[in-house]
UniProtKB/Swiss-Prot annotation:
Comment field on protein domains: The 9aaTAD motif is a transactivation domain present in a large number of yeast and animal transcription factors.
Effect of residue 355 to A: No effect on dephosphorylation by PP2A
Protein name: Transcription factor Sp1
Entry-annotated residues carrying N6-acetyllysine: 703
Short motif 9aaTAD, span: 462-470
Cellular location(s): Nucleus; Cytoplasm
Designated gene of the protein: SP1
Gene3D superfamilies: Classic Zinc Finger (3.30.160.60)
Function in brief: Transcription factor that can activate or repress transcription in response to physiological and pathological stimuli. Binds with high affinity to GC-rich motifs and regulates the expression of a large number of genes involved in a variety of processes such as cell growth, apoptosis, differentiation and immune responses. Highly regulated by post-translational modifications (phosphorylations, sumoylation, proteolytic cleavage, glycosylation and acetylation). Also binds the PDGFR-alpha G-box promoter. May have a role in modulating the cellular response to DNA damage.
Ranges of biased composition (kind: Gly residues): 20-34
Substitution effect: residue 431 to A: No effect on phosphorylation on DNA damage
Lineage, highest ranks first: Eukaryota, Metazoa, Chordata, Craniata, Vertebrata
Cross-link (Glycyl lysine isopeptide (Lys-Gly) (interchain with G-Cter in SUMO)): 16
Length: 785
C-alpha cells in the first residue's frame, strides 16, 4: 500500500462486496459474497493472500449496511464458467458522506456529491489468479446517484428508528402509518409551546408561534344565544278594561251594552244583580239602591212574612217590599206549563204558572232579572240594580229572562212589567238550548199569546210546553219555528156512543193566516186546548210545510181493504199516500211520477177507448177499464198511465235511465227506476208502523201489514187521534213524566210514539201531522163525517 492510501480515514467502514467465484479464488476462504471490514495498512497485499484474512470486529453501521445489502443486485451475477482473468471484483461503498432517506419502498442512500467519490478499495492483481501473488490497490469511483436499500424478508414487522435532525429534537418518528383523529384530521405536533385559549362557544383554539399551523375543532360547539335586553321593550303593557284589575292569566271578556235598530238594547248579563225570590213565601222582596253605586246587596224575603202584610217603603231607606199577591192575578187556566226551551231528550216540566197583568214599583232604567234555576226548588231570582252612567239616560224598561230547566213541581210566579209603549223585553237562553235571542215586544190592546216549544225524546215522543203572555208579540229573528194559536172561546159538543159530534172552532176567514185549523174533522176542545204543529221539528231534518187552514181529509176507497189518508193542501191539489196500492209488478203497475212532478192528464189512445168499448154499456156508473189491445195479452188496467207503461213494455221503450255512476240502466216505468235507485242507496223508505221493520218496496210493506191485520182482526177503517192530557204538578214528579204522544190507529192498528223517520216520510210526502193535546179519544167510523 502506498502512503497516500494509508493517509485516508482509518476507521472508514467499507462494505466489501465480493462476487462469488467458488473455489477458484485461491486466496480467499469464503466462497460466496461476504461482508468484511478491512483496515488499510502497509501490508495490505499480504493480508489478502493469507488464507482467511485478518479481520477486525465490524462496526454497527457496517453490520446495518451489510444486512440491508444481502439481496443481490441485478447486475451482480456469478459466472463460474469464466476464466481466471475474469475474477469477481469486490466493491466497497463508503457510507461516511451518504445520507439515508425514507421512500415509498424502502430506504434510499443519497450521495453527498454529484461527482466521482472514492467509495471503495479493491484489491486486484495476480493474487486473484494465484499466479504471482502481487497486490495492487487502486481507487474505484462510483457515480453520485441514489442507492435504494431494500428491506430484508426476515425483517418484516420490525420498527426501524432513526433520528432526523432539524425537525424536532428528542422525538423519534416510527415508520408506521400516520396517526389520525376521529374526524379524519392528522395529528400535528407543535415545536414550541402553544398558548391555549377558550372562548365562550366552548371551542379550544391553540395560538401557535411562528410558522405553525392552527389546530381547530371541527365539532360543533354549544351555541350560546346572547340575551337581547331590548326585545321586550316593544311589548304593549296590559291595561285593565272598564276599571277592572287584571290578575293571573285568565281571559277577560267585557260585555258592553249594544244598541240596535228598533229601540232594542242588548245588556250584558253580569251588569244585573240578582235577588232571590223564594217561591214558598208569599212576599217578594226587591232591593234597589238610591245611590250611584253599581252594586247593591239583595234582600231576601223569608217564609215568615204573611201574604196579607204589606210593608211600605220609607223615605230614608232605598229598599222597598211589595207583595206578590198584590200584582199577580190569574187570568188563564191552571194547566198551563212553564215555557221550556229545552230540545234535548229530557222531558219538559208541567208545573203551574200564573200570568200577571201588571207589576208596580219598578223605576225607570231599572233591569229586572228573572232566572229559573235547575234546582228542585225551582225558585225565581229577581233583582234590581241601578245602572251606571251609560244607562242613566235610557228611560226604557228592560227585562232580562234566562229560562233554565225546572225539575221541581212547585208553583212558580212570573213577574211582568206594566204594558208600556216602546217597552222591550230581551230573552236569552242558556247555551244548551236551541232558542236564541228570542225578543218579546210589548204591544198594547192585543189578545193573549201562547208560546209552545217542542222537545223530542229518544223514542220519538214529542213534549210541548206552553206559556201564555199578556200583551206580548213574539218575534224570532233566527227563524225558529214557534206556533202561535190565539185562544178563543169554544165549547165541547155532545158525544154519543157511536160517533162524536164536533162543533167547528171558527171559520177560516176569521182566523189569521198561519194558524192551525182542523175543519174537516170538526174538532173542538175544552178551554185548555193546545194546538201543536209537528212541522216545528225542522231542526230534526223534517221538512216544514205551511198550513193555511185547509181541511184534512180522511177517506176510504170503496172496495179497498186499506185506508187512504190524504191531505188537501194549498190550491186544492190532492197529495195522498196510497198505502194499499203499491208496486206489485206488471199486474198493477204504478206509473205515478215523482213527488213534486206534475203531468197533464191525457186521454187514453188505445183502440178500446177510442171505440168506446172500455166502459160497459149496461152500467154507466161502472169504472172505466183500459184493456191492452196487443194480441194475446188482454191485461186490464184502471189507469191510463198504467196502460201506457204496459204498452212501453211491449214496444221495448225504456225512457227512464238510471243516473247513478257507471250504471246507466233503463226502465219502462218510473217506479221501477225509483226502486232501482234504492238498491244503490240502500234506502228503505217504507217503515212498518207496528214493528221496526223497513222495506224498499211499498207492496212488501202492504203484505207485511196484512200479517199484523190477520193477527188482530178483520179489515176495517178507524182513525183514533188522542193524546195524554198535560198534567200539572204531579206529572213532573218522579221519573215517569207524562208527555203528550201521538196515537193513531189505522185498521185497528195502534201507532204509538211515531218515530222521527216516519214523521219525516210523511212530511216529505206533503202531509202535515198535527198533534192535539187535552182531548178525549175520538173514534170515527169508516162512513163517518
Amino acid at each position: 500500500m502506498s502512503d497516500q492510501d494509508h493517509s485516508m480515514d482509518e476507521m472508514t467502514a467499507v462494505v466489501k462486496i465480493e462476487k462469488g467465484v467458488g473455489g477458484n479464488n485461491g486466496g480467499n476462504g469464503n466462497g460466496g459474497g461476504a461482508f468484511s471490514q478491512a483496515r488499510s495498512s502497509s501490508t495490505g497485499s499480504s493480508s489478502s493472500t493469507g488464507g482467511g484474512g485478518q479481520e477486525s470486529q465490524p462496526s454497527p453501521l457496517a453490520l446495518l449496511a451489510a444486512t440491508c445489502s444481502r439481496i443481490e443486485s441485478p447486475n451482480e451475477n456469478s459466472n463460474n464458467s469464466q476464466g481466471p482473468s475474469q475474477s469477481g471484483g469486490t466493491g466497497e461503498l463508503d457510507l461516511t458522506a451518504t445520507q439515508l432517506s425514507q421512500g415509498a419502498n424502502g430506504w434510499q442512500i443519497i450521495s453527498s456529491s454529484s461527482g466521482a467519490t472514492p467509495t471503495s478499495k479493491e484489491q486486484s492483481g495476480s493474487s486473484t489468479n494465484g499466479s504471482n501473488g502481487s497486490e495492487s490497490s487502486k481507487n474505484r469511483t462510483v457515480s453520485g446517484g441514489q442507492y435504494v436499500v431494500a428491506a430484508a424478508p426476515n425483517l418484516q414487522n420490525q420498527q426501524v428508528l432513526t433520528g432526523l435532525p432539524g425537525v424536532m429534537p428528542n422525538i423519534q418518528y416510527q415508520v408506521i402509518p400516520q396517526f389520525q383523529t376521529v374526524d379524519g384530521q392528522q395529528l400535528q405536533f407543535a415545536a414550541t409551546g402553544a398558548q391555549v385559549q377558550q372562548d365562550g362557544s366552548g371551542q379550544i383554539q391553540i395560538i401557535p408561534g411562528a410558522n405553525q399551523q392552527i389546530i381547530t375543532n371541527r365539532g360543533s360547539g354549544g351555541n350560546i344565544i346572547a340575551a337581547m335586553p331590548n326585545l321586550l321593550q316593544q311589548a304593549v303593557p296590559l291595561q285593565g278594561l272598564a276599571n277592572n284589575v287584571l290578575s293571573g292569566q285568565t281571559q277577560y271578556v267585557t260585555n258592553v251594552p249594544v244598541a240596535l235598530n228598533g229601540n232594542i238594547t242588548l245588556l250584558p248579563v253580569n251588569s244585573v244583580s240578582a235577588a232571590t225570590l223564594t217561591p214558598s213565601s208569599q212576599a217578594v222582596t226587591i232591593s234597589s239602591s238610591g245611590s250611584q253605586e253599581s252594586g247593591s246587596q239583595p234582600v231576601t224575603s223569608g217564609t215568615t212574612i204573611s201574604s196579607a202584610s204589606l210593608v211600605s217603603s220609607q223615605a230614608s231607606s232605598s229598599s222597598f217590599f211589595t207583595n206578590a199577591n198584590s200584582y199577580s192575578t190569574t187570568t188563564t187556566t191552571s194547566n198551563m206549563g212553564i215555557m221550556n226551551f229545552t230540545t234535548s231528550g229530557s222531558s219538559g216540566t208541567n208545573s203551574q204558572g200564573q200570568t200577571p197583568q201588571r207589576v208596580s214599583g219598578l223605576q225607570g232604567s231599572d233591569a229586572l232579572n228573572i232566572q229559573q234555576n235547575q234546582t228542585s226548588g225551582g225558585s225565581l231570582q229577581a233583582g234590581q240594580q241601578k245602572e251606571g252612567e251609560q244607562n242613566q239616560q235610557t228611560q226604557q224598561q228592560q227585562i232580562l229572562i234566562q229560562p233554565q230547566l225546572v225539575q221541581g213541581g212547585q208553583a212558580l210566579q212570573a213577574l211582568q212589567a206594566a204594558p208600556l209603549s216602546g217597552q222591550t223585553f230581551t230573552t236569552q237562553a242558556i247555551s244548551q238550548e236551541t232558542l236564541q235571542n228570542l225578543q218579546l215586544q210589548a204591544v198594547p190592546n192585543s189578545g193573549p199569546i201562547i208560546i209552545r216549544t217542542p222537545t223530542v225524546g229518544p223514542n220519538g215522543q214529542v213534549s210541548w210546553q206552553t206559556l201564555q203572555l199578556q200583551n206580548l208579540q213574539v218575534q224570532n229573528p233566527q227563524a225558529q219555528t214557534i206556533t202561535l194559536a190565539p185562544m178563543q172561546g169554544v165549547s165541547l159538543g155532545q158525544t154519543s156512543s157511536s160517533n162524536t159530534t164536533l162543533t167547528p172552532i171558527a171559520s177560516a176567514a176569521s182566523i189569521p193566516a198561519g194558524t192551525v185549523t182542523v175543519n174537516a174533522a170538526q174538532l173542538s176542545s175544552m178551554p185548555g186546548l193546545q194546538t201543536i204543529n209537528l212541522s216545528a221539528l225542522g231542526t230534526s231534518g223534517i221538512q216544514v210545510h205551511p198550513i193555511q187552514g185547509l181541511p184534512l181529509a180522511i177517506a176510504n176507497a170503496p172496495g179497498d181493504h186499506g185506508a187512504q189518508l190524504g191531505l188537501h193542501g194549498a190550491g186544492g191539489d190532492g197529495i195522498h199516500d196510497d198505502t194499499a196500492g203499491g208496486e206489485e209488478g206488471e199486474n198493477s203497475p204504478d206509473a205515478q211520477p215523482q213527488a213534486g212532478r206534475r203531468t197533464r192528464r191525457e186521454a187514453c189512445t188505445c183502440p178500446y177507448c177510442k171505440d168506446s168499448e172500455g166502459r160497459g154499456s149496461g152500467d154507466p156508473g161502472k169504472k172505466k177499464q183500459h184493456i191492452c189491445h196487443i194480441q194475446g195479452c188482454g191485461k186490464v188496467y184502471g189507469k191510463t198511465s198504467h196502460l201506457r207503461a204496459h204498452l212501453r213494455w211491449h214496444t221495448g221503450e225504456r225512457p227512464f235511465m238510471c243516473t247513478w255512476s257507471y250504471c246507466g240502466k233503463r226502465f219502462t216505468r218510473s217506479d221501477e227506476l225509483q226502486r232501482h235507485k234504492r238498491t244503490h242507496t240502500g234506502e228503505k223508505k217504507f217503515a212498518c208502523p207496528e214493528c221496526p221493520k223497513r222495506f224498499m218496496r211499498s207492496d212488501h210493506l202492504s203484505k207485511h201489514i196484512k200479517t199484523h191485520q190477520n193477527k188482530k182482526g178483520g179489515p176495517g177503517v178507524a182513525l183514533s187521534v188522542g193524546t195524554l192530557p198535560l198534567d200539572s204538578g204531579a206529572g213532573s214528579e218522579g221519573s215517569g213524566t207524562a208527555t203528550p204522544s201521538a196515537l193513531i190507529t189505522t185498521n185497528m192498528v195502534a201507532m204509538e210514539a211515531i218515530c222521527p223517520e216516519g214523521i219525516a216520510r210523511l212530511a216529505n210526502s206533503g202531509i202535515n201531522v198535527m198533534q192535539v193535546a187535552d182531548l178525549q179519544s175520538i173514534n170515527i167510523s169508516g162512513n163517518g163525517f
